[in-house]
Amino acid sequence: MNGPSSRSSHLSQPVVKSVLVYRNGDPFFAGRRVVIHEKKVSSFDVFLKEVTGGVQAPFGAVRNIYTPRTGHRIRKLDQIESGGNYVAGGPEAFKKLNYLDIGEIKKRPMEAVNTEVKPVIHSRINVSARFRKSLHEPCTIFLIANGDLISPASRLLIPKKALNQWDHVLQMVTEKITLRSGAVHRLYTLEGKLVESGAELENGQFYVAVGRDKFKRLPYSELLFDKSAMRRPYGQKASSLPPMVGSRKSKGSGNYRQSKSTIGSSDNSSPQPLKRKGKKDSNSEKPTKVKQSVKSKTSHQAIPDNGEGIFKAGAERSETRGAAEVQEDEDTQVEVPVDQRPAEIVDEEEDGEKTSKDANQKEDFSAMNGETEDRGGSKAAGTSEQEEGIPDHGEKKSSPSRVNGGTDEENGEELDQVAEELQPTEDEKGKAEGDNSGQDEAGLDAQRPPRPEVTVTSPQENEENEANKASSAVA
């Protein structure tokens, strides 16, 4: 009974197929494995739906299935074989490609290894050594502008390949050096020899760049410099002058040292430790003597004994040839320093003291009248008309300003004098007004305001008036 039942179970198992599907016309898609289950994939349309989700083609849903080699179209699910390769396509036609080789890594065939070992044969072929071969290094040249002796030479690196193209070399030189005439057309050596090709250029040499103008023969060799002299150690000054040969100190070096030692001994009264006598003293004195002798020799050689001095030019300059020396004359003016000029005597003026006294009196008078001018400013505006009629009255009014400037006692005495002086003037004023009343009334306008009256009061009267006002206000 167990036998037939087991056979029926084997026959009832579902059929499962596995296929590899490629994209139509895609040479880079390596294929996608799709499993066809009998229960899940019951029809061909369901299979197309499964392939659409697995392949994810850019053309959209899969509508046709083709064989990879011949492009035969499959229309039923029964035609698909397990383990086969197929191409999924849309509504477009089949595109023939080598789909089966997509994604496979091609292995290179192994080369046949020669197992036989040949013996070494010593040959007599002459081959140049490798270290003797010239390397392809760039050519370095130094360029100088035509007729320019001021600016230093410019360094230019020319590649080895560019030396064959002479126009390209001239273009590089033009970019490096700017000439007034424009581009660089020719290169010359310092001696004036024309360079016509890049093969004539030598590494590390100096050349003159010339434009449209002619080559100027100048001492370009003065621009050549020693690189070792240009380099200086770290911390040294850039513009360091050479030591002076034959200075004044070198002549009297011995006397200078002796005087310095005597001055130091006189200034410093403290006792100094005694030096030990022996070999050290003799050794220390020898090099100093040698240095002094060397300095004296150099100083005698440097300074000539002509009596003309070191500031006298040895040879005549080309610029001063033919120039005549101008002799001094009576009309020539010579500037003399201030210390050497004769002293000039200035006579004092007789009126100097008088003018100084008048100035001092005016200053004192203006200081005393400073306060009165502010107070009497308003009153002066009203009394200007009266001062026009009587000129002498204005001079006499200056006395009250002095009265206000002093103390109370002085003001009291001066006020009495002022009152006595003003009485005859008031009488004269009344007479003049009586005589000229008819003429003044006829000449004046009816709308003219009356003249203000000026009264002079002492400080004591002012205090009494203020006290009376205060008492009346209290009452």
Swiss-Prot record:
CC terms in the record's Gene Ontology section: axoneme; cilium; cytoplasm; kinocilium; synapse
Domain Doublecortin positions: 17-100, 139-221
GO biological process, one term: neuronal action potential
Subcellular location: Cell projection, Cilium; Cytoplasm, Cytoskeleton, Cilium axoneme; Cell projection, Kinocilium; Cytoplasm, Cytoskeleton
Entry comment describing in which tissues the protein is expressed: Expressed in hair cells of the inner ear.
Origin superkingdom: Eukaryota
InterPro entries assigned to the protein according to its UniProt record, in alphabetical order: DCDC2_DCX_dom2 (IPR033036), Doublecortin_dom (IPR003533), Doublecortin_dom_sf (IPR036572)
Composition bias, Polar residues: 252-272
Major subcellular location class: other
Annotated Basic and acidic residues bias: 353-365
Gene inactivation effect: Animals develop periportal hepatic fibrosis with biliary duct proliferation at age 11 months.
Keyword field contains Electron transport: no
Modified residues (Phosphoserine): S270
Role summary: Protein that plays a role in the inhibition of canonical Wnt signaling pathway. May be involved in neuronal migration during development of the cerebral neocortex. Involved in the control of ciliogenesis and ciliary length.
The protein, known as: Doublecortin domain-containing protein 2
